[in-house]
């Protein structure tokens, strides 16, 4: 295992985050930094900053909130230069994204349910999570709970092989809750630390989704009363604000506890990371920064802003 760094992950993760955020850092966020650097702080600057935050896919309401917080910080601390304002904005953004709690992974086993519409990178995210936790020394088992799509189980099985973890699957059309029940029971009996479960990516309406997921959550507790349960929703960073709007209903119905944001390396905007917690009320737990199996990394607000908005070194 690699030693963990200052922000809860090692140098490898830090480098991956740096590379994965290259487009975002040099794109809109680069122009935000250029706007602030060398500027005097006045209303024009705030207006321009608000506009650029919206272009960076932060969303209107979040952009206004960030700029208002910056105005307050500038006044409170008597900041004079754009460089000082940039450092202050960096801290405000990190605060905005900070989760209130850690992930609940203390159960026997710890169960992570992964949900999301088809096409966002759900299956690959599950394999990458399995790889990540295996590298942390955990014994991981996968549950092929997306039984509505024949290809889903096969795809997950291939990825499970790459991650070197066992998988429990059933025939097409089997009840997802039953597959997940069998997996959790088997994992508990065999001393596995964690079960990561796939779920259907298309359910026709909200009540179907709620029924399916509450069945799954009951089956987890029935299979192993000491299990803990996290439900992570996978979102595609490239579709940004659209993804967040679509996810609102899904989150409520699914009782999600956190977000996996994929394809962050494929967008120059990347501001939707900042908007997710504000708009969905859920913390980002992992970000996808590439195609490789080890390209899903734990998200930390400090690590993120460190790479996105390098400190100018000005005191404030």
Describe each region flagged by the PLM:
Residues 4-6, 43, 130, 296, ...:
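Generic intrinsically disordered, low-complexity segments enriched for polar/acidic and small residues
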Residues 12-16, 119, 147, 209-213, ...:
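Short acidic/polar alpha-helix capping motifs at helix-coil junctions
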Residues 200-202:
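Short glycine-rich anion-binding loops that position phosphate/pyrophosphate groups of nucleotides
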Residues 175-190, 204-315:
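Conserved catalytic-core segment of NTP-binding enzymes
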Residues 6-8, 27, 125, 298, ...:
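Intrinsic disorder/low-structure terminal segments
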Residues 18, 23-147, 152-188, 192-197:
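Primarily NTPase-proximal linker/entry elements flanking Walker-type ATP/GTP-binding cores
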Residues 2, 315-316:
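C-terminal accessory "lid"/substrate-recognition subdomains
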Residues 1-29:
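N-terminal accessory targeting/assembly segments
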């Amino acid at each position: 295992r690699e030693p963990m760094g200052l922000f809860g992950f090692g140098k490898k993760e830090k480098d991956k985050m740096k590379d994965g955020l290259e487009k975002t850092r040099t794109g809109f966020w680069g122009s935000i930094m250029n706007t602030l650097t060398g500027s005097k702080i006045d209303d024009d600057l705030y207006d321009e900053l608000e506009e650029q935050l919206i272009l960076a896919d932060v969303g209107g309401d979040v952009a206004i909130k960030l700029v208002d917080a910056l105005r307050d910080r500038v006044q409170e601390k008597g900041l004079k230069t754009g460089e000082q304002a940039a450092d202050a904005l960096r801290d405000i953004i990190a605060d905005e994204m900070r989760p209130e709690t850690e992930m609940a992974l203390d159960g026997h086993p710890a169960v992570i349910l992964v949900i999301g519409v088809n096409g966002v990178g759900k299956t690959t995210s599950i394999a990458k999570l399995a790889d990540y936790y295996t590298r942390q020394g955990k014994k991981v088992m996968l549950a092929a709970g997306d039984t509505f799509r024949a290809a889903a189980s096969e795809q997950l099985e291939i990825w499970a092989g790459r991650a070197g973890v066992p998988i429990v699957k059933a025939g097409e059309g089997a009840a997802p809750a039953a597959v997940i029940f069998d997996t959790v029971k088997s994992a508990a009996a065999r001393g596995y630390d964690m079960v990561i479960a796939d779920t259907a990516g298309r359910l026709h309406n909200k009540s179907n989704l709620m029924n399916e997921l509450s069945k799954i959550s009951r089956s987890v507790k029935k299979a192993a009363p000491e299990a803990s349960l996290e439900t992570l929703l996978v979102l595609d960073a490239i579709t940004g604000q659209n993804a967040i709007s679509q996810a609102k209903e899904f989150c409520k119905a699914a009782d999600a506890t956190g977000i996996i944001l994929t394809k962050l390396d494929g967008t120059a905007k990347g501001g939707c990371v900042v908007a997710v917690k504000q708009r969905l009320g859920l913390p980002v737990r992992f970000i996808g920064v590439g195609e490789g199996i080890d390209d899903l990394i734990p998200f930390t607000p400090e690590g993120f802003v460190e790479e996105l908005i390098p400190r100018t070194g000005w005191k404030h």
